[in-house]
Regions:
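Conserved DHp (HisKA) dimerization/phosphotransfer helix of two-component histidine kinases, i.e.
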Residues: 37, 41-44, 57-112
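Glycine-rich ATP-binding loops of the HATPase_c
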Residues: 212-227
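Conserved catalytic submotifs in the C-terminal HATPase_c
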Residues: 115-124
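Glycine-rich/acidic phosphate-handling loop/turn and adjacent ATP-lid/helix
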Residues: 163-208, 229-231, 238-242
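Conserved ATP-binding N-box helix of the HATPase_c
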Residues: 21-42, 128-156, 200-214
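Histidine phosphotransfer helical core of two-component systems
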Residues: 2-3, 8-12, 16-23, 31-71, ...
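Short beta-to-alpha transition helix within the HATPase_c
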Residues: 90-107, 135-141, 163-170
Length: 245
């Protein structure tokens, strides 16, 4: 039976909101980090101003530094805001996009005892940034949320050429397969609680909703998930829905 449109929209918006809520602590952490240099510079300026004979040259240098740091903070905040309102037409190389997301979520995964291994660094093919920031990131979170204990997260990528179906003239396009695997490791600290939650857990229904919206094929199990992305923006086949095993 086909799911009503309003129910699909509700599931999609619920998944987006849950992912955003899970992202907020990381955004706040990055904002605090960006503000730290300004705080230090302000403290130095205050100390110099309290001197009986302030050194105007040093104060001028501090003021120049303060202005430069303020611009950097503004740029950082503007960039962080794109995580909440991403541009749908923005593309990014797979290696850069994956590195960005793993860096953003590194603290949460570390706090929960997970180690991240990124093996996508040679994959320069471009994909829509919204796919990585929604489907890929949700897959990472869902996989760790459903894990019974901490482990090693391994991200790999493969680029293949596939036939595009549905055009008058059949052609080929690159398909990027991103695989996220979760493997146990004897040296992992099993005492670290996996369920350090700031909102609710993400599950595979959330991932499916986001994947369908972005036209990404997914195959998921309890030990990993593979995303099939067309960097041409066209989909070769219907999304393959695989039961979580």
């Amino acid at each position: 039976m086909t799911q009503p449109t309003h129910e699909k929209n509700h599931a999609l918006e619920a998944a987006r909101y849950a992912l955003m809520r899970r992202l907020v602590p990381s955004l706040l952490h990055n904002m605090a980090g960006a503000l730290q240099p300004i705080s230090m510079t302000a403290a130095i300026m205050e100390k110099r101003l309290q001197s009986p004979t302030p050194d105007l040259i040093l104060l001028g240098k501090s003021s120049t530094s303060f202005k430069a740091q303020s611009r950097d903070v503004a740029d950082t905040f503007a960039h962080l805001a794109t995580w909440l309102a991403p541009q749908s037409d923005q593309s990014i190389a797979v290696n850069a996009g994956v590195e960005e997301i793993l860096g953003m979520m590194a603290r949460e995964f570390s706090d929960r005892g997970f180690e991240i291994v990124n093996e996508t660094k040679i994959t320069t093919a471009e994909v829509p940034q919204t796919i990585l920031r929604s489907v890929f990131m949700a897959s990472l979170v869902a996989l760790t949320d459903t894990a019974e204990s901490p482990g090693r997260i391994i991200v790999t990528s493969i680029v293949t050429s596939v036939d595009i179906i549905g055009d008058a003239d059949s052609s080929e396009s690159d398909e990027i397969s991103l695989t996220i695997s979760l493997k146990g490791h004897p040296e992992m600290d099993k005492s670290i609680p996996v369920d350090v939650q700031r909102y609710r857990k993400l599950d595979w229904d959330d991932v499916q909703s986001l994947a369908k919206e972005e036209k990404v094929g997914i195959e998921c199990t309890t030990h990993g998930v593979t995303l099939h992305i067309k960097n041409s923006g066209r989909v070769a086949n219907e999304i393959k829905n695989v039961e979580v095993r």
